[in-house]
Amino acid sequence: MTLHLHDSAAGAVREFAPLVPGQVGIYVCGATPQGSPHLGHVRAQVVFDVLRRWLVRSGYEVTLVRNVTDIDDKILAKAAEAGTEWWAHAYRFEREFSAAYAALGVLPPTVEPRATGHVPEMVELIQRLVERGHAYAAADGSGDVYFDVRSWPAYGELTHQRLDDMEPAADADPRGKRDPRDFALWKGAKPGEPATASWATPWGRGRPGWHLECSAMAGRYLGPRFDVHGGGLDLRFPHHENEQAQSRAAGDGFANFWLHNHFVTMSGEKMSKSLGNVLGVPHLLETHRAVVLRYYLVSGHYRTHLEHSENSLVEAEAAYSRLEGLLRRAAERLGGLAAGEVPAAFAAAMDDDLATPTALAVLHETARAGNSALAAGDEAALRTAAGQLRAGLDVLGLDPFAEPWASQTTGSDAARTALDVLVRARLEDRATARATKDFATADAVRDSLKSAGIVIEDTPTGARWALEGEQ
């Protein structure tokens, strides 16, 4: 089976074929670092990290570009409220986002451009649009430059909307616009704004519009046409619609596929700062393992909303621990464990529009087969099942023997180590009792451990233990 992905522009699942055989270019909208990252922010990056890993596993060379919108109206406003320089404010939260991505095992992008480092490319793109009759400088002398939506008949094709049904663009004062739906390519500097937040252009000093930034950076690093543009569902309109319109109006083919992940929700509502229902990533990592947080984020299909409740991460911890536990017991029994090939059913699920819930179900079934092989002492079957499990978890960024998880010592890991010491001491007491035929004491030890949720497995090489539900 070949990879099929849902293309938002087509409104359907299509067979994926890269523009250049063997190579895939992906642009993912990154952070606007105005505040700390929350669970909804990082879902998008985990989703496209999984896509990247699956493409690499499938033999492609992947270039992934993830931008940083480090100049924006919201950044200027937040920095002014905090009494800090706008660039310092942006950099502070950019580092928080980078730390959150790294904590969740998101691979570094091939390129991570900042908007402020690509103003010349943005000015050049505006000039092309002006020359082609698709952009104009505001007549009020504000220094604003707008995209003329009525000059581009295909405007609205990405989101399947008619122009006359759209709301006015709220990114600038409408007084200088020919049509209220025209959107800003360049924003003229305004009184009271920091001088450092503007650049000289043929239209006066100012700063780039949000939509223009991504088009210019995507073109700079991926060329005029590339394979996949990704981002959250909330970016489809107006951001991605505007990106596509301005890029194609300038003569670029732009993205061949558009992929959009859905939201993390709480009580059915999108997680957002404006609603005050966000769960900050740094806060969550104080009480939960990062790998469990990632497991939770990949447990739902990327095109469905992921409902979060107080039990979500508890359930994710239990589910991941079952997979992790089998791998650790297999590695102990086999003296090490190499990744094998992913199960065929896992590959089929991933090729079916990244059906990660189905892929995880396959891995849990594989783990059950591994546990059966372990109990039966069938090391060949154990090696096969555990190797397949490890390979599948690696695609999802969840392999406990790979970085960043292999080198982490979390509070949960430390607790597991301490528990292991205590249980092994009790198992030694049980072994001594059995050796002296004191079976009453041996049974009492076993029963006390069982009542604590610890299951004992007697093997030819000695007793082993697991938490109930892991075996």
Curated annotation (Swiss-Prot):
Biased segments, Basic and acidic residues type:
172-184
User: Which SMART domains does this entry report, sorted A to Z?
Assistant: DALR_2
Q: Which cofactor does it need?
A: Zn(2+)
Which top EC class is named for this enzyme in its record? ligase
Xref: InterPro entries? Cys-tRNA-ligase, Cys-tRNA-synt_Ia_DALR, Cys-tRNA/MSH_ligase, CysS_C, Rossmann-like_a/b/a_fold, tRNA-synt_1_cat_dom, tRNAsynth_Ia_anticodon-bd
| Cofactor details (free text) | Binds 1 zinc ion per subunit.
Nucleotide-binding is among the record's keywords: yes
Q: Which CDD domains match?
A: CysRS_core (cd00672)
Where is this gene product found? Cytoplasm
Residues bound to Zn(2+): C29, C214, H239, E243
- Residue ranges for the region (Disordered) are 164-201
Motif 'HIGH' region is found at 31-41
Q: Where is this motif: 'KMSKS' region?
A: 270-274
**What are the EC numbers?**
6.1.1.16
- Gene Ontology molecular functions: ATP binding; cysteine-tRNA ligase activity; zinc ion binding
Q: Which GO terms describe its cellular component?
A: cytosol
Q: How does it assemble?
A: Monomer.
State the protein's name: Cysteine--tRNA ligase
- Species of origin reads Kineococcus radiotolerans (strain ATCC BAA-149 / DSM 14245 / SRS30216)
